[in-house]
């Protein structure tokens, strides 16, 4: 004999007061979340929430009625794992995320291996471009070496309202802009630098060295952490390693570092204790006098070998102003030379031909939302990637003329704000 299913009225009358309260709190939070997200298409999910908390037409926890202890145990674990993954996914996207510092670009402020809890609410969380992804993995499953995300569906760029805006001097975690295309075996230097020096065909043909060339959506590009030094609308420039904004020198971070070559008198070497006192990590120091590849560079920098053609102890390492002053006081230090900016190779944009280096760069106007820049043959390379890759336009040059989305253009109005980021460890920052 079948038992009639309770009516909707009977189901609602049977709901305990505590469940009504829990549903009310959850519903209000969900509605506020939809407003914040500016996406009202998710509101029908309230019907599902009402069934979970109140009506229970769908047996969401059917497995709890099983008399099989193994089924109960397994399903409890599955339930807990699914709940945890969904919670971590939502927390990482909209509230805060854990990051590990991979390089020494902010050495002294943030050390290699440090773990950061980064607030997504500070500047407003970005809605994911690839919503179907596995939590806790950026773009590739370790060991398996396969993508940790699915490219469909793909959502356009959209950032939610936050508690504030980026300010000069802020330390910011962001997705590396030039990481849209990657040679998987050589992710650093970036693909565009490899193409500049090796050629596009050279990278694609030599898969043993460079691996497959893959495209990554914005939210799946590698995470970088730097300090903001240039704001939208600023005219940014570096002169002799000093940053200028709109023609005025800005205050340097307290622990700013530059690379130096330090030569000691014959018979002397730095001890581990001295390196620790100077704050120089093992990864950041090199004993270059023993490396053949440095011979010509050392001669060009003014270091002189002995009669046998050998150099005394010469170290290459980053130093803060405080550490540099300490080294200058060592009686057995015979010469200190700051690494020239040219040692870092060409600066952005590659192929610009103006001789810009990391020590002498610009001036460069940083694009600002709503502002217009006049496009010329001279500044085309400066704004090419921003207009084409970051703002989604079809940009090309034909017969000395510039075309945007098929129409000839002599100017462009930017849709987004742009920022200039630098590491405090200036000469060891990608």
Where are the model-predicted features located?
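Extended hydrophobic leader/signal-anchor segments used for secretion and membrane insertion
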Residues: 1-430
